[in-house]
Regions:
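Extreme N-terminus nucleophile/cap motif
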Residues: 1-49
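C-terminal active-site-proximal or functional interface alpha/beta core segments in diverse enzymes
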Residues: 69
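Conserved small/polar residues in nucleotide/adenosyl-binding loops
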Residues: 74-76
Length: 76
């Protein structure tokens, strides 16, 4: 199972994506990742654990860019 969230707008995408993934986390996840687009580059950060754990480890919410996608997975 997985949850996917996307954002495109004027604000920084990463904090919005992290917040959205946290709101869907009640299911319990094994891994999470975020990709954003900034200056014609796609930037990716990911890790194993709950959203807050991965965010603390790799600073998901600090990725630059105002377009992005977030994904969380539970491995069954």
């Amino acid at each position: 199972m997985c949850s996917i969230i996307g954002y495109r707008g004027k604000n920084s995408a990463a904090p919005i994506l992290v917040n959205g993934l946290q709101r869907m986390e009640y299911r319990g996840y094994d891994s999470v990742g975020i990709a954003t687009k900034s200056k014609n580059q796609i930037l990716l950060r990911k890790g194993i654990g709950k959203v807050v754990e991965v965010n603390n480890a790799v600073q998901l919410d600090e990725l630059p860019g105002n377009i992005g996608i977030g994904l969380s997975l539970i491995h069954i």
